[in-house]
Amino acid sequence: MKKLVVLACLVLAIPNFAIQEANALDPNSVASIFDRLTSNKELANPSVIVIDEKTGEIVFEKNSTSPRKPASVLKLLTATAAYTYLQPTQRFTTSAFVGTKAKTLVIQGSLDPWISLIHTQAVKMGRTSLPRIEFSTLNALKKANNGSLRNITIYYTNLYSQDVANIQKFYFRHGVHAAMKRVTTEDAQSLSADQILSSDSPELQEILAFTLTWSDNLLAERIARLASAAAGHTSDDAGVGQTFDEVLNGLGIESKNLVTQDASGLSKLNRITAKQVGTLLIKIRENAKFAPLIGGLPIGGISGTLKDRFIKTAPQAVGLIKAKTGTLNGTSNLAGYVESGDREYAFVILADQLRKTHTAESLARNTVDRILGRIAFPILPGVIEEAPGQLGVTDQFGNQITTTN
């Protein structure tokens, strides 16, 4: 299956192109390429590490222990924490009920990170729709109380504060002053009468794959807090930081120099080293538990935040790179795996000292693409004679979705 995916990728990127059998670059050659190209001024003294996945040998490193801004590369740590402390097959259920008391309703949540504020998006992607909950509960309240909507109380459990605020705003816009009261799970059950609706999320591993593929910041933040709570810590930035430290230490990775202010990578105060990320990539590659995490990474020239990369800059690398992007103003990072024949290398490039211009960031991305293009080789003998029609690229839910990386 892996070879078929690579073949399709190459056909898409290089139609009518003769692909000769390629041998893996030996570690010395890889080191030479990185040594020469990472000195390029476009990368502005990056932090870099390359590790042979088969042997665990560090093939090349430059500033690898220098703390740098990870940007969305931090989501690798978020996903690792999720697979460490949460069940990948876990689903999140959100249900609404008419209350046992007059003029009340109950929303029983499970901290579903997948709830969507946009109904059309929710329908398209199989997400729990907050607007559906709002309209359905409003209509049920009207019916149960003969149209009277004064002095309404909404009891809820396990909802995010943002979702609670949105529900209250919805009711206010419709002329209803609803009192929102948080209760325990047990109380919510005892206060519930007839069910209005119930919605289940996909499995957590599917949500995580989407989070990594499209670099969804809100999902990353919510999932990290779920993992933090499961690890026995608080569900805030401090708790997430403790959880991330434990994840690294649990994998035998020194957590010194790790600074986290969030779980999405948006904070410019976050710090991590290329060596920490590179070692993490090797550790999760060795453990089958993390296979879905790696499967959720964007593929160069094919999917997610890498779908438009390598196609022009290094077409020979299309389909051969799985990596997490990380972009902030003045930062262009990439961390993941590159296939080189029968070898695979884990790589981390943290270029966080760029000039804060679109041109500088674009030049840095192109330079990174070309570096990896020098290393990437398929295990593909022979010649591709003719390319089939354009291949459609969608996410795992069958949708073409664009987000920031």
Segments (PLM) and residue ranges:
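A small/polar active-site loop signature that marks catalytic segments
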Residues: 139-296
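Beta-lactamase-like hydrolase cores
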Residues: 13-67, 136-146
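Conserved catalytic neighborhood of penicillin-recognizing serine enzymes
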Residues: 101-132, 194-224
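Active-site SXXK
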Residues: 56, 70-88, 211, 347
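Small-residue-rich helix-loop
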Residues: 59-61, 231-405
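Solvent-exposed coil/turn segments that connect beta secondary-structure elements
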Residues: 51-55, 63-66, 99-101, 110-112, ...
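Positively charged n-region of N-terminal signal peptides that target proteins for export
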Residues: 1-4
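Short, well-structured active-site flanking segments
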Residues: 85-102, 179-184, 290-295
